A protein has these predicted regions:
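Hydrophobic beta-strand positions
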Residues: 86-87, 138, 238
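AMP-binding/adenylate-forming catalytic domain of the ANL superfamily
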Residues: 220-244, 263-265
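Beta-strand->loop->alpha-helix junctions that form or flank phosphate-binding loops
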Residues: 51-57, 77-79, 183-186, 232
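AMP-binding/adenylate-forming catalytic core of the ANL superfamily
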Residues: 91-94, 105-107, 111-112, 119-129, ...
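Hydrophobic/anchoring residues in structured secondary elements
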Residues: 26-29, 182, 232-233
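Gly/Ser/Thr-rich phosphate-binding loop
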Residues: 9-73, 84-86, 91-94, 109
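Acidic/polar alpha-helix N-cap and adjacent early helical turns
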Residues: 252-265
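Core-facing hydrophobic residues within beta-strands of well-ordered domains
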Residues: 21-24, 82, 177, 199, ...
């Protein structure tokens, strides 16, 4: 997963080049979109051997690209090579090229989530002809797919739709950040505000100085409403065994949905 790339890139130059990589012919990654900066750095290091894919067991679709395709279409997760994709708005109307919407696929068979009929129902369109895992993205004129974020992670702050992945993609490659998560937390005036939770690199203190440095860095790349209102620090960002970010565990603490105490205030 891209997180592994980010962590490897933070190795010292000596550690990066102490092994003979001549037998390393292929590197395949998926599970989450890779920040463009990270992908470029990995290609510079390993060469044109990196392949990317996108797919979900439930969604009946699969996208793929090799290194050159990605360089020609930076940020893509690949071209759909299996399945029928539709990019739709909230009214189930097809969107034009380049405009983000929910990704829906035509199922080839039925599926259901174990002991979760509500989630199963939400994954299907009303006519049962399409299914989704609520990823948001768009396609370009060449048919390449780009992911924006998960719809369930979208932050609505003061009527503005904010996708946290954009901020995460900037934070994770930062030299003082080992891992990061960005999500919405309650705000009485705005509905939600942007929160960042950071796992600093070992030896780096999660203090006001680092917070100011990170916010200043983000302000050079993001519009004001996309910048976190606050940053908390944590010993370890929770991830699933696959490397996927366990964002719900972090969000639930702030929304009062469990008694998690994993965040250091």
């Amino acid at each position: 997963v891209p997180t592994m790339f980010s962590r490897m890139l933070k190795l010292s130059e000596k550690e990066k080049y102490m092994y003979d990589l001549s037998s390393h012919k292929y590197a395949i990654h998926g599970a989450a979109p890779c920040p463009e900066k990270v992908k470029h750095q990995m290609i510079d290091w390993w060469g044109p051997i990196i392949y990317e894919y996108y797919g979900a067991t439930e969604a009946f679709g699969f996208a793929y690209c090799n290194t050159q395709e990605w360089l020609d279409h930076p940020g893509t997760v690949g071209k759909i090579v299996s399945g029928e994709l539709a990019v739709l708005d909230d009214n189930m109307k097809e969107l034009p090229l380049g405009e983000p919407g929910t990704l829906w696929f035509k199922p080839t068979s039925e599926f259901e989530y174990f002991n979760d009929s509500e989630r199963t129902s939400e994954a299907y369109s009303e006519d049962k002809k399409l299914t989704t895992v609520w990823d948001v993205g768009y396609t370009d004129s060449d048919g390449y797919l780009y992911l924006t974020d998960r719809k369930t992670f979208m932050i609505i702050s003061g009527g503005v739709n904010i996708y946290p992945q954009e901020c995460e993609d900037l934070l994770i490659p930062h030299p003082k950040v080992f891992d990061a998560a960005v999500f919405g937390v309650p705000n009485d005036d705005l509905g939600e505000e942007v929160k960042a939770v950071i796992q600093p690199i070992e030896g780096i203190a999660g203090d006001e100085k680092l917070t100011n440095e990170l916010l200043d860095y983000l302000s050079q790349h993001l519009s004001r409403q996309k910048i976190p209102r606050s940053i908390d620090y944590i010993d370890k960002i929770p991830r699933l065994p696959t490397g996927k970010l366990y964002k719900r565990l972090l969000r639930d603490k702030y929304w009062g949905r469990d008694s998690s105490k994993i965040i250091k205030q």
